């Protein structure tokens, strides 16, 4: 058994050490302006995911939310954060005492990062592989509970009708809360990505009111370690239980388990700028009994509202209660279907380490502020059993390659020594469901999956320097969103530019892909320390409204031009073995007038 298999087996042994596991969307990258109790304004940023997260000012000073105000954080010997008595301010407004506290914080920052890594590593070693995922073919019935709190109720107009449209409708209209910002409903998204093979039907109940206030469930810890999430799920089910005449309709595969229940809760999510007392959007395995031998496997939980700089006033107060985008909901639901996070869950960020906004399981859930999440990639569609990729074995010309969501095909170049490792080639067009993508072009990425099965616990891109699902960037550099932003190594504008230049030709106008270009992730692994060339090169990559055209060549075959028009040959043709042929055969490579050509 290889070490990857051993590691996965160990993870499964640890199933018996824990009963509950959660997976979540990362914090929405962006700055939020808040008004402090002394009347000053402070710009803050949020990082991490629901397992461990933190907040900093625009220059990187750690702060703690206490009672709605942000205080300079103290770091204790265990690396934990607590609020000091000093309100946080922008750099130019800090007095000497605040500056001294920040200097002490800076001297102890290594303790905080060590604690963060320990928390995340512990989580990685105690995640159970539960199975029992939501079926993803045909029509699947899914219960959706609208849950309010004793001190927080739904404020969007007509919540039941609004979420019927949000979840099930083919048309998005504004009902007073920017509902039409969402490009599609959740159902429509999956119908498009599966070419009509998967049609989830969401049955809405509520709103129900839970027995406690929001902070009881959301907790008060700045790092999110005290959420009462299991109690939240149980209370929501208890309040909705009598509204469900027959729970068995939500057991879609007849195994005695309700695969997934969705909860949309009133207010904001902590992952999108909500206060410390709010709940972080997540997918979670809870195993809750609903009677008659039925248990609920997974919960998909996301908030009512979207927090953005364009819908708050100068005091940091929401002035427009926008409905949330579908991106977070779809990301979490995809976990309940078995897909893992493709972002780096350890928060040790590295460039060229993932899919970034090209994948809904990475940062693509937040495209267009999460109102237009990225379509499933070819890899995900194949994992779901919706569309198989075509394996490339010989040189060929591809003309007008369309995206899969438009009926196109995707190709993969497989490592002959390892069937789980391959290069994926697919078309992405900035239109339709992907109209808010960062560019159109040929998306190329490397898959080196550690097992023959995909599981939501996998975290394939956590091995720094050896990502398992990662883009081959045309420009040679795909920045990690975690390294961009105010006070970071890169600006948000630079990150966006790297996205646009990561496809072929892209903004970098790269029209070929060969091994000697030494682009990140364009190779196969021999072992952990050595790589080898892929064995195929791409040439003459062009983009038009009709799709992406290019040549795939076996490495070492020179000067293969665009395919000839099929006609009666007027000169001699020879095979690569030097045998003359009178009539060329479609799809084969020949020597013709001292050039290699593919006959069509």
Question: Residue locations for each model-derived region?
Answer:
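Bacterial Sec-dependent N-terminal signal peptides
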Residues: 1-26
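C-terminal tail/sorting-segment detector
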Residues: 5, 588-600
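N-terminal prosegments of processed precursors
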Residues: 23-131, 416
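A residue-level detector for well-ordered beta-strand positions
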Residues: 33, 328, 571-572
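Short, solvent-exposed loop/turn elements at domain surfaces
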Residues: 42-44, 52-56, 72, 81-83, ...
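Propeptide-to-catalytic entry region of secreted or membrane-anchored zinc metalloproteases
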Residues: 99-329, 340-349, 447, 452-554
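Extracellular hydrolytic enzyme modules, especially secreted metalloproteases
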Residues: 260-262, 266-439, 449-450
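Residue-level detector of functionally pivotal "anchor" positions at catalytic/ligand-binding pockets or at interdomain
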Residues: 553-580
């Amino acid at each position: 058994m290889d070490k990857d298999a051993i590691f996965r087996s160990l993870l499964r042994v640890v199933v018996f050490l824990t009963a509950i596991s959660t997976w979540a969307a990362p914090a929405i990258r962006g700055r939020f302006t808040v008004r402090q109790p002394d009347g000053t304004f402070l710009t803050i940023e949020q990082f991490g995911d629901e397992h461990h997260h933190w907040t900093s000012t625009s220059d990187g000073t750690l702060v703690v939310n206490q009672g709605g105000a942000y205080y300079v954080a103290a770091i204790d010997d265990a690396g934990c954060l607590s609020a000091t008595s000093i309100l946080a301010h922008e750099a130019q407004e800090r007095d000497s005492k605040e500056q001294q506290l920040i200097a002490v914080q800076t001297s102890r920052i290594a303790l905080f990062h060590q604690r963060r890594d320990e928390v995340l590593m512990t989580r990685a070693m105690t995640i159970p592989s539960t199975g029992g995922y939501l079926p993803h073919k045909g029509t699947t019935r899914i219960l959706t509970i609208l849950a309010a709190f004793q001190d927080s109720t739904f404020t969007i107009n007509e919540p039941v009708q609004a979420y019927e449209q949000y979840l099930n409708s083919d048309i998005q209209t504004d009902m007073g809360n920017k509902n039409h910002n969402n490009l599609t409903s959740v159902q429509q998204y999956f119908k498009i990505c599966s070419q009509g093979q998967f049609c989830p039907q969401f049955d809405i109940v509520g709103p129900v009111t839970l027995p406690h206030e929001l902070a009881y469930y959301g907790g008060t810890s700045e790092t999110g370690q005290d959420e009462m999430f299991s109690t939240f799920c149980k209370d929501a089910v208890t309040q909705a239980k009598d509204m469900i005449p027959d729970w068995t309709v939500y057991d879609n595969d007849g195994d005695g388990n309700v695969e997934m229940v969705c909860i949309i809760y009133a207010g904001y999510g902590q992952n999108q700028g909500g206060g410390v007392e709010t709940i972080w959007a997540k997918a979670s395995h809870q195993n809750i009994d609903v009677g008659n031998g039925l248990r609920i496997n997974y919960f998909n939980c996301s908030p009512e509202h979207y927090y953005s700089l364009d819908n708050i006033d100068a005091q940091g107060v929401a002035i427009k209660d926008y409905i949330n985008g579908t991106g977070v909901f779809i990301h979490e639901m995809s976990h309940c279907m078995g897909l893992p996070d493709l972002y780096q869950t350890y928060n040790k960020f590295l460039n060229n380490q993932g899919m970034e906004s090209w994948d809904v399981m990475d940062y693509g859930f937040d495209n267009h502020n999460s109102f237009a999440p990225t379509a499933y990639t070819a890899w995900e569609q194949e994992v779901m059993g919706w569309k198989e990729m075509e394996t490339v074995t010989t040189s060929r010309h591809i003309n007008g390659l369309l995206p899969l969501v438009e009926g196109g095909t995707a190709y993969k170049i497989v490592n002959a020594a390892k069937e789980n490792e391959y290069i994926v080639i697919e078309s992405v067009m900035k239109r339709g469901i992907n109209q808010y993508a960062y560019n159109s072009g040929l998306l190329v990425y490397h898959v080196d999956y550690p097992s023959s099965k995909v599981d939501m616990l996998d975290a394939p891109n956590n091995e720094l320097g050896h990502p398992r699902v990662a883009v081959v960037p045309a420009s040679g550099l795909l920045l990690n969103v975690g390294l961009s932003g105010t006070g970071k190594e890169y600006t948000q504008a630079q990150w966006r530019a790297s996205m646009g230049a990561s496809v072929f030709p892209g903004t970098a106008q790269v029209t070929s892909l060969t091994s000697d270009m030494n682009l990140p992730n364009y190779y196969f692994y021999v072992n952990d320390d050595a790589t080898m060339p892929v064995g195929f090169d791409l040439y003459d990559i062009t983009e038009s409204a009709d799709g992406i055209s290019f040549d795939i060549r076996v490495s070492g075959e020179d000067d293969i031009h665009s395919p000839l028009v099929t006609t009666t040959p007027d000169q001699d043709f020879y095979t690569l073995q030097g045998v003359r042929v009178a009539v060329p055969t479609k799809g084969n490579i020949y020597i013709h007038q001292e050039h290699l050509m593919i006959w069509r």
